[in-house]
């Protein structure tokens, strides 16, 4: 009987420790969800920069076409 109690106590102890480790990992994972990595920030900045450059190019092209049209009086 004593051996059975001892082994059950040991199993309870191991289960408690493993549960504690799982809770620590879970709380660490929850903390990281809201943070963006530096690579993600850089990627977003690069996409915005590329979109702004493309927008400026297309706007500049439109202005130049309108200017050429007005100068040639072909509009």
From Swiss-Prot:
Subcellular localization: Secreted
Keywords: Amphibian defense peptide, Antibiotic, Antimicrobial, Cleavage on pair of basic residues, Fungicide, Secreted, Signal
Main location: secreted
Residues cleaved off as propeptide: 23-40
A Pfam family hit: FSAP_sig_propep
Leader peptide range in chain numbering: 1-22
Biological processes annotated in GO: antimicrobial humoral immune response mediated by antimicrobial peptide; defense response to fungus; defense response to Gram-negative bacterium; defense response to Gram-positive bacterium; killing of cells of another organism
GO CC entries: extracellular region
Entry comment describing in which tissues the protein is expressed: Expressed by the skin glands.
Family: Belongs to the frog skin active peptide (FSAP) family. Brevinin subfamily.
Function: Has antimicrobial activity against Gram-positive bacteria S.aureus ATCC 2592 (MIC=10.0 uM), S.aureus ATCC 43300 (MIC=15.0 uM) and B.subtilis (MIC=40.0 uM), against Gram-negative bacteria E.coli ML-35P (MIC=10.0 uM), P.aeruginosa PA01 (MIC=5.0 uM) and P.aeruginosa ATCC 27853 (MIC=5.0 uM) and against fungus C.albicans ATCC 2002 (MIC=10.0 uM).
Protein name: Rugosin-LK1
Species lineage: Eukaryota, Metazoa, Chordata, Craniata, Vertebrata
């Amino acid at each position: 009987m004593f051996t059975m109690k001892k082994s059950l106590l040991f199993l309870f102890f191991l289960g408690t420790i493993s549960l504690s480790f799982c809770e620590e990992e879970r709380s660490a994972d929850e903390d990281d969800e809201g943070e963006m990595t530096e690579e993600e920030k850089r990627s977003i900045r690069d996409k915005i920069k590329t979109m702004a450059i493309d927008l400026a190019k297309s706007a500049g092209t439109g202005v130049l076409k309108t200017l050429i049209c007005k100068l040639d009086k072909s509009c």
